[in-house]
Amino acid sequence: MDINDFAKYPLYKSIIELNEEMERRNIPPIELNVVGGFALMIHKMRNRNDNSTDIDFVGPSLSQEIKNITNEISIRNNLVKDWLNNDLMLTGSTLEDIEFSTGRLTFNPAFELSRIKINVATLESMIKLKVIAIDTALTAVDNSGDFSRYKDFADIINLMKKTGLGYDDIGKMLDGYIINPNTLSVIKEYEKSGREGVEIKILLLQREALDNKIKIMSGEALESKTYVRSSFTEDLLNNLITKSKEKNYDSR
C-alpha cells in the first residue's frame, strides 16, 4: 500500500508531512501499531474522508519533539491537537498493557516511509479492541457512569460480517477478558434495534445495578444492626442477664 495515493486526505497528508519534518530534523524512525478509525480506513471499511479526526496507535508515547511537530501540523491542517495519540480507553498504552485486557493482538505492515512505519491491526484484533472498549464502558455504566462507545457498535457488526465471525466465536476469542456479562447481548441488541434499543437496555442495566447496590447497602445496614451492638446496648443486655440469673437463684 502506498500512502501517497491517499495524500489529499488530511490524516494521510499529515503523516506524510510529519515524516518529511522528521527527516529534515534527522529524528530517529518510529513504528506505529495503528488501531481505531484510521485502521478501518486502511482496511477500506471506512471512507478515507469520514469523520475520523485522529490516529490511535498502541505503543510508547511520542517524544516531545515529535509532539511539537504534530501540534504544528494540527494547526496547519485544521486537526485536533492530539491527532496522533496512544490515548486508548483501555488501561495502559504499551502493546503488553493492552494485550493484558484483550489477549494477543496482531498487526500487519501497511506502509513505510523513510521515518515512519505503519502497521495496522488485523480485523480480528480490531474486533477484540472494540468489544473490550464496549465492555469497559458498560462496567463504568454499572458504576453510575455514562456510556460513551456508541460509535463502536456499527464497526463491530461490519467487522463480524467481513470476517464471518459470530457471537460464539467472539465469546471464545475473548474468554477470560470480557468482564461485563451483558457485553455481547448489548451488541446483539444494537444489531437488532439500533442505538435506541441499546439506550433502553443500558437504562435497564443501570436500574438493575442501582437496585443491587440498594440491596447490598440494606443488607450491610441490617447486618450492622444485628451483629454490631453499641456499648450501651451491650451493658444493658449484660445487666438484664445478671438480674435474670439472680432472680432464678433467689427463687430456689
Question: Language model features by range: what are they?
Answer:
Residues 1-252:
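Compositionally biased terminal segments of proteins
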